[in-house]
Design a protein with these regions (language model features):
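A transmembrane-helix-recognition feature enriched in membrane-embedded lipid enzymes
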Residues: 1-60, 112-113
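Soluble catalytic domains of membrane acyltransferases
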Residues: 54-157
């Protein structure tokens, strides 16, 4: 039953807040990154935190004070589930993005919210497209966004 409630909330929130997402994406297309970031900061941590609570996850953070506040960071995690992403979205104060496999970018609504979070979709089958995506992630880090990259043995197959 908990899983059903979790999925209903996951998709329900995205559907209910589709107009907000649409507005944020329009702002990004117009070059207004600050407004898009503000929308993401307002909605995404709340959504991710609720998902963690619905799953029964208790969060304890140690060492957050060691994260430099004056420059962007890249977090390389050995991620085993999507809860790692939810944790990052709820615990990091600075604007952030993700590097995700391209297949995630094919999921409606999820793709839009991830674009609002400056997510870069990585094509692991095509080395040139993968390098383009990684260069885009590097540019986002230079702009001041925290980035999370899951550790895998090989980025490109």
């Amino acid at each position: 039953m908990r899983t059903l409630i979790w999925y209903c909330y996951f998709w329900g929130y995205m559907l209910i807040h589709w107009p907000t997402l649409h507005r944020g994406l329009k702002q990004l297309e117009a070059g207004d990154w600050q407004s898009g970031d503000a929308l993401a900061k307002q909605h995404v941590p709340h959504w991710a935190n609720r998902l963690l609570k619905l799953a029964g996850v208790t969060v304890e953070v140690y060492g957050k004070e060691n994260i430099p506040a004056d420059r962007p960071c890249v977090f390389a995690v050995n991620h085993r589930s999507y809860y790692d992403i939810c944790l990052m979205l709820t615990q990091m104060d600075a604007p952030h993005g993700l590097v995700a496999k391209k297949e995630v970018g094919a999921i409606p609504l999820v793709r839009g919210w991830m674009r609002l979070l400056h997510c870069v979709f990585l094509d692991r089958e095509d080395p040139r497209k993968a390098m383009t995506a990684l260069n885009e992630a590097i540019d986002n880090v230079k702009k001041g966004y925290l980035f999370m990259r899951s550790f895998i043995r090989r980025i490109i197959r």
